[in-house]
Structure formats: structure tokens, C-alpha cells
Amino acid sequence: MPDIKLKNQPFDVAFHPKEPVVFSSLLTGQVCAWSYDDATGETSSSWSVRPSKRTARALSIEENGDEIWMGGKSGSLFQLSTRDGSMTRERDSAHECPINRVYCVNRNLVATGDDDGVIKLWDPRQADSIRTYSQHFDYISDFTYFDDKRQLVATSGDGHLSVIDIRSNKSTPLTVSEDQEDELLSIVPIKGGQKAIVGSGLGILSVWNRQMGWADSVDRIPGHPASIDAIVALTPDIIATGSEDGMIRVIQVLPHKFLGVVATHEEFPVERIRLDRNNKWLGSVSHDECLKLTDVEDLFEDSDEDDEMEEDEPDSDEEKSKKKKKDNGMKDMSRGQAENDGSFFADL
């Protein structure tokens, strides 16, 4: 699998929404861009800039792909051109403490969250934030957005998630969940946005049903031996998780099933994972000074074929045997890719 060797530790990864370009932010305050081949994943450096001398922690790209936003340890917020890295705007001291997460909600709204739990909303056309929220008392770890209800959901190290109605002019959230008694580190929508999955510091995946509200989760999926720092949806029913133990696992949700390991950063914790515009390349960054691109296209093909096979149940023992061998395909592949760490199932 293609790896991009870096000179310093990366903290975030992002893909261009329209072109084969991947970005990463580094410990040194740099933001780097590479073009890659859609088929092979082979990369070539496009540009590298250093907007800040302090750690560049978080990246997010506007939906049109023209600009990428960066926040970090300095508390400042930067807008850069995705074409050449040139700075289009700097908001000095946008937060009073380090920015931990940046999220482009839509073309007219960007959310940022800092180490103290403060959330700010920004209009790209204005210099100052348009609203500030302070319902959390520990760092903001992740954001996701549900467009049907115009709801921005934030997770925090304080054990709560909160929901913000972006249409409201009030600086108070729509709701704050009950204390989950664990750090909430990552979130992603599943099932076409009907539900959400949240990763925690103790290695638990919690399932949240939007129809039942955001007060508490409705189900829990144990099994990860370490914290779940990053999540991405591969299909409406299948997610990939990046964990503190360096492994990227694939999990089916409802019904719950651990499918295997698709990549590993050895013993280094996975900081972030992202999926590219074609759902082929999974980008991941860790403390190993490497941006890894993993081809996950076959997983989608297997999922589609499995769905068809479930609809047409096998009539013979021979057909059942073939299906069983096919289901074991990703498990075998996973063991091969993570042979230095042992199989995924042995770790649980």
C-alpha cells in the first residue's frame, strides 16, 4: 500500500472533494499537499507551506474544494488555497487556547472547537466569529453534521455530546447528552443519517438513534482494546475505526460484527482517518511520521456481493460453502496485513 513518508508527526488528513489530492497538517505547523493516482495511489508532492510555527492540529476543506481551513496550538485560524497553499485569510487568536478540531459545515459556515471545550461558528466572509458556545468543559474532539435538521453535533473529552441548531441565533445548544462517563473522541453518521456511532476512550462504540433523541446512546459495542480516536463510514452499515493500538479495523453495525483489520501503524496510535471522494483510498495518520493510503475498494465490492447473496439464500451445501469461504476473505487479508501484530480477533 502507498505510504507518504513525512519529516515530522502528522496530526490530521483531508482529501479534496473533487480532485485526487490529499492534505496533512504537521507538528511543525506545516500543511502539505500531494496529488495521487486514483488507480494506484502513487503520490507526488504538490506544495508545502508553514502558516504557523506551532502545531497544525486540524484540517477541513470547504465543500467546493477551493480552500482548506487549518487550526492548531497557536489558537489562530487559517484559510489556505488548495491550489498552491497561499493564505487567503488569517484570524489571529481566533480562540484563547489551542484549536483541536475544525469542521466545514457548508459553504457559509465553519465550526471550530478548542482545548477548553469552547465552540465557535464562523462565516468565511467575516473576520470575527458569529457565535460562541461554552456547554463543554473539556476539549472538543470531533464534529459531524445532519443537514436535514440543520444540526451540528460535537463530541468532547468531558463525556458529553452536544447538538447545535445552526439556524438559531442563540449561543446555547439544542441539547446536551447525559454524562457517558468516558471521553467521547469521534463521531460519524450511519444508516443514511438515522443513527450515529461515537468512539470512546475506553474502546467502546456507542450507537445513538436520532429518533430517540440525544440524551443517551441506545446500544454499545465493546471489543476495541484501546481508545477509538477516529471513525469513518465506509458504507451506511460499515465503519472503519482508528485506535490507540495502531490498528484500523472494519466493523459492521446493526447487526454488529467485527470484520477485520485493513491497515496498521504498528504500535503507534492512529490520529485521524479519512475516505477519499471515490471511496477507494482510506487515508490515515499516526505518530509514525507516515501518511498511509489503504485501498478499501474491494471491501465495497464484497459488501455489495454479500447483500445479493443474502437476498438469494444458497440452496445447496456447496453454495453455502462458497459463501463461507467468501466471507472469510477479508479476515484472511486482514491477518496478512497485520501479521506483525497478530490477528485482529486475537487482540480482543
Curated annotation (Swiss-Prot):
One of its GO terms (cellular component) is nucleolus. Pfam families: WDR55 (PF24796). Signal peptide: none annotated. Residues 299-348 are annotated as: Disordered. SUPFAM superfamilies: WD40 repeat-like. WD repeats lie at residues 5-44, 51-90, 94-132, 135-174, 179-218, 223-261, 264-304. Keywords: Nucleus, Repeat, WD repeat. It is found in: Nucleus, Nucleolus. Its main location: nucleus. Residues 299-318 have a biased composition (Acidic residues). PROSITE patterns: WD_REPEATS_2, WD_REPEATS_REGION. InterPro entries: WD40/YVTN_repeat-like_dom_sf, WD40_repeat_dom_sf, WD40_rpt, WDR55, WDR55_POC1. The keyword Repeat applies. Belongs to the WD repeat WDR55 family. This is WD repeat-containing protein JIP5. The gene is JIP5.
